[in-house]
Amino acid sequence: AIEIRKRLVEKNADAYEPDLADSYGAAGVFYHEQGQSDKAEKYYLDAIEIYKRLVEKNADAYEPDLAMSYNNAGAFYDDQNQPDKAEKYYLAAIEIRERLVEKNAAAYEPDLAASYNNAGIFYDNQGKRDKAEKYYLDAIEIQKRLAEKNAAAYEPDLAAFYNNAGALYSDQGQSDKAEKYYLDAIEIYERLVEKNADAYEPYLAKSYNNAGVFYKDHGQPEKAEKYYLAAIGIRERLVEKNADAYEPYIADSYNNAGLFYAKQNQPEKAEKYYLAAIEIYERLVKKNADAYEQDLAGSYNNAGVFYKKQGQPIKAEKYYLDAMEIYKRLVERNPEAYEPDLAGSYIIAGLFYKDQGQSDKAEKYYLAAIEI
């Protein structure tokens, strides 16, 4: 399609450049999703170049397309860990969409809310929490107005925006605000599940899991348990329908439940959930090691810590060393990403052997950690 449209543009640019820009944008999205970053970048920028020319001729017609192209480029550079470029394009999209909203709020407020939310996520990940808060709240303000007019269309995104704000405030130690937004998200998803369980149960389970983590961290174990088990109940049902899609999520829930029950000094339940998580991650690693080995290593470490506290050093040692072997493999592929995990694994092993009175092994692992 691109080659055909390029030939048509050579004959009549005014007529066919919009179609060519659209094709470039679609190709950028495709190659982005396929992980072919060089091609994705080329097509995203080609689309932007055309839309910028078109905007000079007819801003009313093409500014929405240019804003979308800027937003796509921002997401691309965000994924490529190029924050300066990501910020540039995210803000360029926002600037256009704010102008469009002044002209036609009904048509363009949904896009502006999405851009604000994207910027919030970006700044949140960059540790710029004040900016993240501003954009999250701007997105929520718009989305609430939209949901009042058309709940079916806009409540799902509003719930997602609430979750983002909840996570931000939780990280900031603003527990009252965090709780409010987490519960607001749950309230919406529970309503949506009543209408369409297949579509929204995964999101409700995630919200329950978020609430469980929140209440665990804030010393409210009864509420934490309630939400952890609610998330597990949904995810177990989802796994029965589609194991490939939902096993990673139930493994995460099992791991969280293991951590919770270990902290509550309920070792039988903790062990049950730790081992259930490991069993799933081991299966997932056989299918896709790149995606799940890190999660498996984390679960092995959790089990090691658990068995050490339970006075079962043989099992603890096994899981510590299993985790270490995974981190060694990961370091071979990507030292920058995984050397901190391997160093942490060495330190854990050093402490373990020190407590077991095996000073030579303890020293070996301490020195290995220092070397990293």
Regions found by a protein language model. Give the residues of each.
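Conserved alpha-helical positions within TPR/SEL1-like repeat arrays
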Residues: 18-33, 48, 64-78, 94, ...
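Low-complexity/repetitive intrinsically disordered segments
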Residues: 1-18, 23, 33, 347, ...
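Flexible helix-coil transition and linker loops at the boundaries of alpha-helical arrays
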Residues: 7-18, 53-63, 98-109, 145-155, ...
